[in-house]
Swiss-Prot record:
This is Switch-associated protein 70. The PH domain is essential for phosphatidylinositol 3,4,5-trisphosphate binding. It comes from Bos taurus. The lineage of its organism: Eukaryota, Metazoa, Chordata, Craniata, Vertebrata. Residues 210-306 form the PH domain. Tyrosine-phosphorylated. It holds the Pfam family PH. It is found in: Cytoplasm; Cell membrane; Nucleus; Cell projection, Lamellipodium. The SWAP complex consists of NPM1, NCL, PARP1 and SWAP70. InterPro entries: EF-hand-dom_pair (IPR011992), PH-like_dom_sf (IPR011993), PH_domain (IPR001849). Its main location: cytoplasm.
Length: 585
């Protein structure tokens, strides 16, 4: 029902458009009433004047004012349509309403009846969208069918040239442009009007009237058993046969269903090219004009029965549906491709923008890189100059350090030499101290010896003086005693002489001791000087190798010859050592 409704709407659209004089999409209510009445008549739909008047009343409460004409058309007409009306009569009524307004005034190579058939074929082949157009693929299909029906070869190159000159702003042709294209003879050059008209009629019969095959054949009668020539017309559910091809005198029908079959028969009774059509209640024997026609009819009937078994539509409708689905698929693919292309274009534009942004960024980066490279080179030059300066300074510092190291090495060597010298000085100082100690011991011994000699000398002097006094006293006492005293004097003089000699000897020994003492004193002074000299050297060297410290606050010892060459602690240590030696002696 949906397909039938779509086909009916195409014819109604033409009629409605013809009534829309100002192309505003609106038609007067009186005209719509007339159109609706005519549609109900040709479509054999019960006509309800009350519903019609209710729908088209003058106030604004009716459905037309709110929803337009389509709701009424669907509800009151199209939904009630049955497949029992005359399609040709319906199309002719719609054609009558629109032909005068739209058909070209240019002279055509075809009749108005042929133009009507082209118009109906257009509605069959047009796309299911409004305004109605026929696309170039369907135009090519129709022109091929017409050319084939005229018995001439198809000029594909001519059609390709036509498509090249086709208006790119349009997706296809309108019904009136298609009529003008067929009627101007552009694709039927060399053909007479009758041939073109026959071709249009043949294509019309196939596409619109569902005529699958037609032609003259001889049929055997059922009652009289005679053979009579009839004009046979094969349709999807029926084979009708007429007296002639004008279809005015119909003689009967052969109803086809899935249980029918067709068989080839051998020649008999002088009849050739026989075949048999078996139906549920009847069998029909038919004779074709030749074997080719026989085979074509058998094949056509067999294909029709096979389609009935499958429940498939006629081949031309199925082919139309396949072409539409293919175009729909191609259109969807094209739309998808266009969408993808648009997305790709957008993506490309985005990419271009991104690339432009990247290019700008790269240019900026290149500029920054160049600037940075310039700065880097400048920095590198500065760094190289600084590095060279640093290198020179480092070399100078290294040289200075090497010199300092050499100097320090030299100073260290000198320091080590001074240390060695200081060690030698310490040893020599030790030896000098030992010599001084020995000299002091010798001095002490000589001093003690000298003191003892002085004591002995003093004792001898005292004794001599005593003897001298005694001698003087003895001289003064008596002369007698003088002799004795003389003797004693002589003895005493001898003794005195001996004492003098001893005294001289002692004096000599004292002088020797004094000389020895002077020698020892000189040696002691020399040792003291040597000790002082070594101490000064040691102090000097020690001052070179040790930190400067506060000087000692201990007072120097004073001897007969000046400041002592030793400290109080050293003196105490030596006194302790002398006492220990005395104790051991």
């Amino acid at each position: 029902m949906g397909s039938l409704k779509d086909e009916l709407l195409k014819g109604i659209w033409h009629a409605f458009t013809a009534l829309d004089l100002d192309h505003s999409g609106k038609v007067s209510k009186s005209q719509l009433k007339v159109l609706s009445h005519n549609l109900c008549t040709v479509l054999k739909v019960p006509h309800d004047p009350v519903a019609l008047e209710e729908h088209f009343r003058d106030d604004d409460e009716g459905p037309v004012s709110n929803q337009g004409y389509m709701p009424y058309l669907n509800k009151f007409i199209l939904e009630k349509v049955q497949d029992n009306f005359d399609k040709i009569e319906f199309n002719r009524m719609c054609w009558t309403l629109c032909v005068k307004k739209n058909l070209t005034k240019n002279p055509l190579f075809i009749t108005e009846e042929d133009a009507f058939k082209i118009w109906v074929i257009f509605n069959f082949l047009s796309e299911d969208k409004y305004p109605l157009i026929i696309v170039p693929e369907e135009i090519e299909y129709l022109l091929k069918k017409l050319t084939e029906a005229m018995g001439v070869s198809w000029q594909q190159e001519q059609f390709e040239n036509y498509k090249i000159n086709f208006d790119d702003s349009k997706d296809g042709l309108s019904a009136w442009e298609l009529i003008e294209l067929v009627g101007n003879g552009q694709f039927s050059k060399g053909m007479d009007r009758q041939t073109v008209s026959m071709a249009i009629n043949e294509v019309f019969n196939e596409l619109i009237l569902d005529v699958l095959k037609q032609g003259y054949m001889i049929k055997k009668g059922h009652r009289r058993k005679n053979w009579t020539e009839r004009w046979f017309v094969l349709k999807p559910h029926i084979i009708s046969y007429y007296v002639s091809e004008d279809l005015k005198d119909k003689k009967g029908d052969i109803l086809l269903d899935e249980n029918c079959c067709v068989e080839s028969l051998p020649d008999k009774d002088g009849k050739k090219c026989l075949f048999l059509i078996k139906c549920f209640d009847k069998t029909f024997e038919i004779s074709a004009s030749d074997k080719k026609k026989k085979q074509e009819w058998i094949q056509a009937i067999h294909s029709t029965i096979h389609l009935l078994k499958l429940g498939s539509p006629p081949p031309h409708k199925e082919a139309r549906q396949r072409r539409k689905e293919l175009r729909k698929k191609l259109l969807a693919e094209q739309e998808e491709l266009e969408r993808q292309m648009k997305e790709l274009q957008i993506a490309n534009e985005n990419k271009q923008q991104e690339l432009e942004a990247v290019r700008k960024k790269l240019e900026e980066a290149a500029s920054r890189a160049a600037e940075e490279e310039k700065k880097r080179l400048q920095t590198q030059v500065e760094l190289q100059a600084r590095f060279s300066t640093e290198l020179e300074r480092e070399k100078l510092i290294r040289q200075q350090m090497e010199e300092q190291v050499a100097q320090k090495s030299s100073e260290l060597e000198q320091y080590l030499q001074r240390v060695r010298e200081l060690e030698d000085m310490y040893l020599k100082l030790q030896e000098a101290l030992e010599d001084e100690r020995q000299a002091r011991q010798d001095e002490e011994t000589v001093r003690k010896l000298q003191a003892r000699l002085l004591e002995e000398e003093s004792s001898k002097r005292a004794e001599l003086e005593k003897w001298h006094l005694e001698q003087q006293q003895a001289i003064q006492t008596t002369e007698a005693e003088k002799q004795e005293l003389e003797n004693q004097r002589v003895i005493k003089e001898q003794a005195l002489q001996e004492a003098l000699e001893q005294l001289q000897q002692l004096e000599l020994e004292r002088k020797q001791a004094l000389e020895q003492y002077e020698g020892v004193k000189k040696k002691l002074e020399m040792a003291a000087k040597m000790t002082k000299s070594w101490k000064d050297k040691v102090a000097h060297h020690e001052g070179l190798i040790r930190l400067i410290e506060p000087g000692s606050k201990n007072a120097h010892l004073i001897t007969n010859w000046g400041p002592a060459a030793f400290t109080q602690a050293e003196l105490e240590e030596r006194q302790k050592s002398w006492k220990e030696k005395k104790t051991t002696e």
